[in-house]
A protein has these predicted regions:
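Membrane-interface alpha helices of multi-pass inner-membrane proteins
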Residues: 58-73, 84-86, 103-110
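Specific aromatic-rich, kink-prone transmembrane helix
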Residues: 33-50, 62, 66, 83-84, ...
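Transmembrane-helix signature of polytopic, membrane-embedded enzymes
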Residues: 1-15, 33-34, 53, 57, ...
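Short acidic/glycine- and proline-prone juxtamembrane loop motifs at membrane-interface regions
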Residues: 24-31
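Membrane-interface anchor segments at the N-terminal boundary of transmembrane helices
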Residues: 218-312
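Short hydrophobic alpha-helices at membrane interfaces in multi-pass membrane enzymes
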Residues: 3-7, 49-67, 96-99
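Short helix- or helix-capping micro-motifs
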Residues: 6-17, 37, 41, 66, ...
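Membrane-proximal stem/loop segments at transmembrane-domain junctions that anchor or position
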Residues: 120-257
């Protein structure tokens, strides 16, 4: 990587206070984006050099990073599957590694979800967590066109949502879907879901503009650079011990060393201070990183070598998950995209160097 990218990466990940501050938190995000970064680095190493040199080291890093992704966040499994499929079709030399990763990853998840969790009475997460976009559209439709909802549609929706008649007024927030999602019953049947999506599609056909407005209200923060981001402050200030909210309310016995209180306060104050500076503040802006990601894609596609975009695929998938997330422009969801910034810049610089070398050879 060019020297300027190395220094930028060092400053971005260590001196700028966002990632050090998240390092103090005790939530799954930090472990997930660290696993993603290691996955990306080992991914790039395989694409460039294969696994001939230091074969065992590269494979172990790739495997550990893959397992970390699927264990820390549910989206990690989908990201890994898509990445492995792309690797298998466009970079087949290490197909045994991809197959081993997929099989062992499946075995780990099968044991945890089908054996360990049932044995310890641990329930799966609510299905509503993955349906933010359609639920928001249903809630907005009820708010704007409630009088047009037929009795049959109301009966189906009331069976799935606890307070459907008040969903659009009392529970709909254009940028946060949590209140609307909470109205969905915990364990809907396949028949209930089938009927719901029939109603959802029928209402979309009647008023598609309402659905588009609901979706854009929920996602514009990932493309709009003039939006003030939340920086994940509520979660950070709770999990670093600044807020009075006790972690015991979440059945977590977590303590905060009083001798580190000053450091925690310093990190929180620094991030709010740094984000006021021009240009630097863009590094803490979800919309800016969305455009950067699109810039990588355009540049790599323009290189006329489609395989070069493979490294960006994991970041693109994370960004797609952000768009479908329950909170608009939430920087916490963008952390995996942001931490890949130095690696993605390095990859583009490497491709430029390779292109120049190829032209000189000709």
């Amino acid at each position: 990587a060019p020297v300027w990218i190395r220094w930028f990466g060092l400053l971005f990940l260590t001196v700028f206070p966002l990632f050090p501050m998240w390092g103090f938190t005790m939530v799954k995000d930090a472990q997930y984006y660290i696993s993603l970064l290691y996955f990306g680095v080992s991914f790039a190493d395989i694409l460039v050099d294969g696994t001939e040199k230091k074969k065992w080291w590269k494979q172990i890093v790739f495997l550990c990073a893959s397992y970390g992704m699927i264990l820390c966040r549910k989206e990690g499994r989908y990201l890994l599957v898509c990445a492995l499929i792309c690797l298998f079709f466009y970079h087949k030399k290490q197909w045994k590694l991809y197959l081993f990763t997929a099989v062992t990853g499946f075995m780990i998840l099968f044991y945890i979800e089908q054996i360990y969790m049932p044995a310890h009475d641990i329930e799966e997460g609510r299905l509503a967590e993955g349906l933010s976009a359609p639920i928001q559209q249903t809630a907005r439709y009820q708010r704007d066109h409630g009088a047009e909802v037929t009795e049959e549609e109301r009966a189906i929706l009331s069976e799935l949502f606890d307070d459907y008649d008040q969903m659009g007024t009392a529970h709909y927030s254009p940028e946060i879907s949590d209140a609307a999602k909470d109205q969905m019953i915990s364990h809907p049947t396949k028949e209930q879901l089938k009927n719901y999506f029939k109603v959802w599609f029928a209402q979309f056909c009647k008023h598609p503009d309402t659905y588009f407005q609901a979706f854009f209200n929920q996602t514009y923060g990932y493309f709009y650079t003039d939006r003030k981001d939340r920086l994940g402050t509520p979660i950070i200030e709770t999990t670093v011990g600044r807020e009075q909210l006790s972690m015991e309310e979440f059945y977590m016995e977590i303590g905060f060393p009083p001798q580190l209180k000053g450091m925690r306060e310093f990190l929180i104050g620094m991030i709010h201070f740094v984000t006021q500076f021009p240009l630097i503040s863009l590094l803490y802006n979800a919309g800016f990183h969305g455009y950067l990601l699109l810039g990588y894609v355009v540049y790599l596609l323009g290189s006329k070598k489609g395989k070069r975009i493979l490294l960006i695929v994991p970041t693109l998938l994370v960004f797609a998950v952000c768009i479908l997330s329950p909170v608009n422009g939430e920087l916490r969801y963008m952390l995996p995209v942001m931490i890949m910034l130095p690696l993605n810049l390095t990859w583009c610089a490497y491709q430029e160097r390779e292109s120049v070398a190829e032209k000189e050879e000709k």
